Amino acid sequence: MAIFYSEKTAKQTAKNCCKTTARQIVNIHSLDYQGLDVAKINGKTWFIENALPNEQVLIHVIEEKRQYGRAKANKILQASPLRQQPSCISYPQCGGCQMQHIKLDVQRQTKQQAFFKQLQRLQTEPIDWQPMISGQDKHYRRRTKLSMAIQRNQLVIGFRQQNTHQIIPLTDCEVLEQPLSTLLPKLQHLFAGWKMKKALGHIELVNADNTRAMLVLHIGKINAQDQHMLLNFAKAEQLSLYLMCDENHIEHLCGEAPYYQINGLTLHFCIRDFIQVNQPLNQKMVNKALEWLAITAEDRILDLFCGIGNFSLPIAQQAGFVVGVEGVEEMVKQAKINQQTSGLNNIAFYQTNLAESFVDQHWATQPFNKVLLDPARQGALFCLDHLMALTPERIIYISCNPATLMRDAEKLIRHGYKIAKSAVIDMFPHTGHLESISMFIK
C-alpha cells in the first residue's frame, strides 16, 4: 500500500503492546492515500481509521489477521494540526466518506504524492507530473444509491455504517448535489407511510441535466395504494420514476428519459447505465483527454470500455474516425442512439466482451493510431495483449484503481511504451478513491 506523510522523528511504538488488545493506546506514524493511518504494534502493521500522523489515539480493534490488523481510533489523546472538524454530523458513522477529518489540501497532497511515487517506480525516464484535476469538495455527486431497512420497527433510509450492515438515517448529505440532498427527508416521510415496507430494496437517484430520476427496487408486487402514493410523489416533485423488481425488468412510470450534456452533445442514458457521478470533473477529464490525444483530422481513434459515448463522441468532433467498444449491450444501444442524435457520421459503436480475445472482430482489423482506455476497477490487462497488435502510437488511460493501473502500466512498458505524463483526478473528495489520467507513448 502506498504510504505518505511518514514523520522521520516519529517513534513507531505502542504502549501496552505485550499483546494486541481490543482497546489500546498507539502512536501513529504515517498516512496512506485512502486515509488509513499506519502504526506498528508487536511488529505487526495496523491500518487505523480516524487517526493522523503524530497523533496518540485510543484504538478499538476491528479485525486482526496474521500479517496485519484493522482498527479505529475512538478517542484522540494527542491531536495533529492536520486534523479538522468534520462538517457532516453523520461522520464518521456514515460510510459515505472516510476522510472528512483530514484537511482537504492534505487529502489531495497525500493522494498525489502516493500515486506519483508508485507510478515513477515503473520506469527510469522522468514522468511529466501534471497538476491535480480537482473541483469543489461538497455537493459534487449527481448519483447515489440509498439503502433501506427496518431498524427498531422503523424504516430507515441512508448509507451503510462503516464496518457494519447498519444504516445511518440521512435527512441531508453535503456530498450529494443539492437537488438530490433535498429529497432525503421527503423520501423518509414518503416511505414511512407505505403498507408494504418489507418489499422495499433500495433507491437509486440521479440528477440529470433535464430531470431528477428515481429508481425503486422492490421485492414482489407493490400494492395499488403504495404505488399510487409513490406516483403522486414523483409527479409532485417532477421526478422521472422507475420501478425494478428484478435485473431484467425496469418499468418507467413517469417523467422524461434522463440525459446530460458535454461539449455541446446530448447523451441520453438509461437509469442504470454507468455515468461519471461528478459532472464538473467529468467535463475537465474529457477535455484533458482530448488535449492529450492531440487529435487531428487524420486520426483513427479507438475508445475501449466506451460506455454510452462519454469520450467517444467528443473525440469524434475532432478526429477523422472513431470506434467505440463496450461490453454491456444495452449501453452500446444507447451509445448508437446518442451517435444518431449527435449527427456525427464518423463514429461506430460495437459490443464486444473485452475480457475475451477480440482479434477476430471486424473493428479490430481496422487501423488505429491512438487509443483511449477507460476500464472499470478490474483494469484492462487482458485486452492489452490484443491491443498491442494494433501498435497505437499513443494511449490515454483513465483509471479508477491505482493497483490495476500499476499492473497494466508495467505491461505497457514491457511492450515498449513509456509514461509521458500523468495527473490525479480528485473525483471523490473526502473518500479513499483515487482516479487518474496517464499518457503512454512509443
From Swiss-Prot:
Active-site residues from the entry: C400
GO biological process entries: rRNA base methylation
EC number(s) per entry: 2.1.1.190
Every TRAM domain range: 10-75
Bilayer-spanning residue ranges: none
Gene3D superfamilies reported for this sequence: 2.40.50.1070, Nucleic acid-binding proteins, Vaccinia Virus protein VP39
Binding site for [4Fe-4S] cluster: C88, C94, C97, C173
NCBIfam families: PRK13168.1 (NF009639), rumA (TIGR00479)
Family of the protein in this entry: Belongs to the class I-like SAM-binding methyltransferase superfamily. RNA M5U methyltransferase family. RlmD subfamily.
Name of the protein: 23S rRNA (uracil(1939)-C(5))-methyltransferase RlmD
